[in-house]
Design a protein with these regions (language model features):
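A general "terminal functional-core" signal
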Residues: 1-191
Length: 191
């Protein structure tokens, strides 16, 4: 998630690791604004498989919000729809490995209607193992464009995003350090 230093409600720091018997069970990786897909996916890969291997859950409950998408007006993360597809596929693979395929995907978060509708459609298709279409129906796009006063994307995936993030390398390095710091905070509590 985006760092609470930049986004309401201001919580979710690496030091927030749970309390009492739950100490070490809250895992927060506060990412810097302008985190791009590669850095986000790297943080996911660094943390989530490790945590699932430790906790051995019976089921994965994944909140699949779309507010990390680069078009979202409230957050400052820069994920593409392709990154979301990668995350969804990785979650299914992890569910197969750790929970015998048991996963519950919930929806919530995301405030750009075109991006949200496409990302959640990608999720629905990936979960059902259905190939993603190369384009969206023109009549559907025309009908809904009239309701949201914005042109809808002709495809489920974004055009190749190109961001002019001047601190790209520094952001990626800080996100790497943050995810490693979080693991250093929680793993001593894992027995």
């Amino acid at each position: 998630h985006e760092s609470g230093q930049y986004l309401f409600p201001g919580s979710g720091g690496v030091e927030e690791i749970g309390e009492g018997a739950g100490r070490g069970t809250a895992l927060n990786v506060p990412l810097l604004p302008h985190t791009e897909s590669d850095s986000y996916l790297a943080a996911f890969d660094r943390v989530v498989p490790h945590a699932l291997a430790h906790f051995g859950p019976d089921v994965i409950v994944a909140q699949c919000g779309a507010d990390a998408h680069y078009k979202d007006p409230l957050a400052d993360l820069l994920l593409s729809s392709e990154a979301y597809e990668t995350l969804f596929r990785q979650l299914l693979t992890l569910a197969d490995k750790h929970t015998d395929g048991h996963i519950l995907c919930t929806l919530g978060g995301g405030y750009h209607l075109d991006a949200v509708s496409r990302i959640w459609t990608v999720l629905a298709l990936v979960v059902q193992d259905i190939d993603l279409p190369t384009s969206l129906p023109d009549d559907w796009r025309e009908r809904w464009t009239a309701h949201i006063d914005e042109d809808l994307s002709p495809t489920l995936h974004d055009p190749e995003p190109s961001f002019n993030v001047k601190r790209r390398a520094a952001i990626a390095e800080q996100n790497k350090e943050t995810s490693e710091q979080m693991l250093e905070q929680v793993t001593p509590h894992w027995h």
